[in-house]
């Protein structure tokens, strides 16, 4: 498995001329401090910038997690098991010869009550060294057309504080606005789902970290 892989599709020149770049690196998410945002701005510009055309919208969300980035990344990188921390996923199926690398796919079944039943998703980016991953929705029964997402995991450390190491997770997306919906409605729905997922990710990985610390303490004794 390669540490860093990515792929992209060519963009039509006429379409490209009508697009504008997102400015997520200039707008601080509400869950970040100014110091965190300053340190993350370069990564946001690099990994969380999209080209927007008519009928498209995008957003960036952040989650602070009181656990080391290695622990958080061990969960986030599992393209084959999104249900570990993602709400509303009933099951995820991959092929028998599945290998986690750019281009692999998963078939996700969504719980009832959402405007979706199934989703086929493709791994677009996986960089274990920089802790970056991304996927796009390529098919299925849902309303999120041309959905593309990137998630990055970032380490923070302050020696003078008791809790020296923590993690910030950034997740962004770009998607078509469904017919009959506004950009605001589309962002509200997608943001809510992602925010719930990130909160669950924090809960799970913080518990993992506590268990690791307890085990280490027991061994020391």
UniProtKB/Swiss-Prot annotation:
Spell out the Low complexity composition-biased ranges.
1-11
Q: Which keywords fit this entry according to its UniProt record?
A: Abscisic acid signaling pathway, Acetylation, Cell membrane, Cytoplasm, Membrane, Nucleus, Protein phosphatase inhibitor, Receptor
Q: What domain of life?
A: Eukaryota
Report the residue ranges where the short sequence motif Gate loop is annotated in this entry: 112-116
Stretches the record annotates as Disordered: 1-22
- Residue positions where N-acetylalanine is found in the record: 2
Protein name per Swiss-Prot or TrEMBL: Abscisic acid receptor PYL1
Q: Which residues bind abscisate?
A: 86, 116-121, 143-149, 171
Would you tell me the Gene Ontology cellular component terms?
cytoplasm; nucleus; plasma membrane; plastid; protein phosphatase inhibitor complex
| Gene Ontology biological process terms, A to Z | abscisic acid-activated signaling pathway; defense response
- Subunit architecture: Homodimer. Binds ABA on one subunit only. Interacts with HAB1, ABI1 and ABI2, and possibly with other PP2Cs. Binds to CARs protein in an ABA-independent manner, both at the plasma membrane and in the nucleus. Interacts directly with CAR1 and CAR4.
Annotated phenotype, changing residue 189 to A = Reduced affinity for ABI1
**Pfam families found in the cross-reference section:** Polyketide_cyc2 (PF10604)
SUPFAM superfamilies given in the database record? Bet v1-like
For this UniProt entry, what is the primary localization, expressed as one broad class?
Answer: cytoplasm
Q: Where is this region: START-like?
A: 50-206
Changing residue 111 to A: reported impact? Normal affinity for ABI1
Question: Changing residue 88 to A: what effect?
Answer: Reduced affinity for ABI1
Q: What is known of its domains?
A: Upon interaction with ABA, the 'latch' and 'gate' loops change in conformation leading to a tight dimerization and the creation a surface that enables the receptor to dock into and inhibit the PP2C active site.
Which cellular compartments is it found in?
Cytoplasm; Nucleus; Cell membrane
Marked site positions, Involved in interactions with PP2Cs: 115, 182
